[in-house]
C-alpha cells in the first residue's frame, strides 16, 4: 500500500516484527529499518530472514521499561504479555530515536500500551501504521480508543485496509 501511495521513508520502526516479512519488504525502499520482536522463536527467524542492514532487537515494546513474560494465546501463534519475567520491555521514548518516518505496530492487542510509551517520539513521527483488530480488548482497550489517542497526538487516518490503518500527521 505504501508504494501505491508514493510514500517515502528513511527511518522505520517495526514493532512486532514477527519473522521479518514486513521488515524485508520495507527495507527494499527505506533507508533504515529497526525491528523489535520479543518472542525467542520468532526472533531467531527474524534474524535469519532480514538483510544485515535491518537492525533487530529481541525486546518487547510497551508503556514502561520492565521485565515481562509471554504466554501462548489460545490456539494462535500470537503471544500475550502476562506479567513479570525474563523478557525485557522498553518504551519507544526510552530508545531516544528521532526523525522516525513510520512506526509500524502489530502487537496482537498491545497497541495502546506501545502508543502510551511513544508519546514524545510521536511528536516527530510522520506516519503510524497499526493493526487494529479485536485483540485490543485483551488489554482493556478498544480500537476507537486507539484512534482517539492518535488523533489527540496529531494524526488522522490516511487509508485503511482491514485490519491495518495508516495514520498521517495532520
Question: Model-derived features: where do they sit?
Answer:
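Phosphate/nucleotide-binding beta-alpha loop and adjacent structural elements of enzyme active sites
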Residues: 1-170
Amino acid at each position: 500500500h505504501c508504494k501505491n501511495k508514493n510514500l517515502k521513508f528513511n527511518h522505520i520502526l517495526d514493532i512486532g516484527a514477527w519473522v521479518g516479512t514486513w521488515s524485508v519488504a520495507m527495507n527494499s525502499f527505506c533507508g533504515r529499518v529497526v525491528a523489535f520482536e520479543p518472542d525467542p522463536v520468532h526472533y531467531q527467524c527474524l534474524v535469519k530472514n532480514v538483510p544485515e542492514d535491518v537492525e533487530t532487537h529481541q525486546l518487547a515494546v510497551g508503556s514502561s521499561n520492565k521485565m515481562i513474560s509471554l504466554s501462548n494465546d489460545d490456539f494462535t501463534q500470537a503471544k500475550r504479555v502476562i506479567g513479570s519475567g525474563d523478557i525485557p520491555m522498553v518504551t519507544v521514548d526510552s530508545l531516544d530515536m528521532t526523525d522516525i518516518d513510520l512506526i509500524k505496530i502489530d502487537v496482537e492487542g498491545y497497541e495502546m500500551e506501545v502508543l502510551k510509551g511513544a508519546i514524545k517520539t510521536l511528536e516527530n513521527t510522520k506516519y503510524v501504521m497499526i493493526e487494529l483488530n479485536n485483540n485490543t480488548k485483551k488489554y482493556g482497550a478498544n480500537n476507537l480508543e486507539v484512534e482517539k489517542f492518535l488523533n489527540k497526538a496529531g494524526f488522522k487516518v490516511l487509508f485503511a485496509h482491514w485490519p491495518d490503518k495508516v495514520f498521517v500527521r495532520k
